[in-house]
A protein has these predicted regions:
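Acidic, low-complexity, intrinsically disordered interaction modules
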Residues: 21-79
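Mixed-charge, Lys/Arg-enriched low-complexity segments
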Residues: 1-15, 64-95
Length: 95
């Protein structure tokens, strides 16, 4: 497992207080108004001990000099890496 994936797994476990096992990496390109809103790799984790979700999607990005981590639980309407990215973008847009 790469250092990035390990760091994301640790972030998922800390935030969601459950065990996370890496399942796969999924490339995602999310378009918005015919422009790329996000292009990267989403890590998929199987969760053990979480009361609401069996999976979590996680990724990181750089903002300025800081690395930011994003985790999105697989609860409706989130059902894939693609919909996790959409949900995160929508959540940020509301802020």
């Amino acid at each position: 497992m790469s250092a990035r994936t390990t760091q994301l797994r640790n972030t998922v476990q800390t935030i969601h207080r459950c065990k996370a096992v890496h399942v796969k990496s999924v490339p995602v390109i999310e378009m918005f108004w015919q422009k790329v809103a996000w292009d990267g790799v989403v890590e998929v984790f199987r969760l053990a001990g979480h009361p609401k979700a069996k999976r979590c999607y996680a990724w990181s990005y750089t903002e300025g000099k800081e690395t930011r981590f994003v985790t999105v639980l697989e609860v409706p309407p989130v059902e894939s890496a693609q919909t996790a990215v959409r949900a995160a973008i929508a959540s940020e847009a509301k802020k």
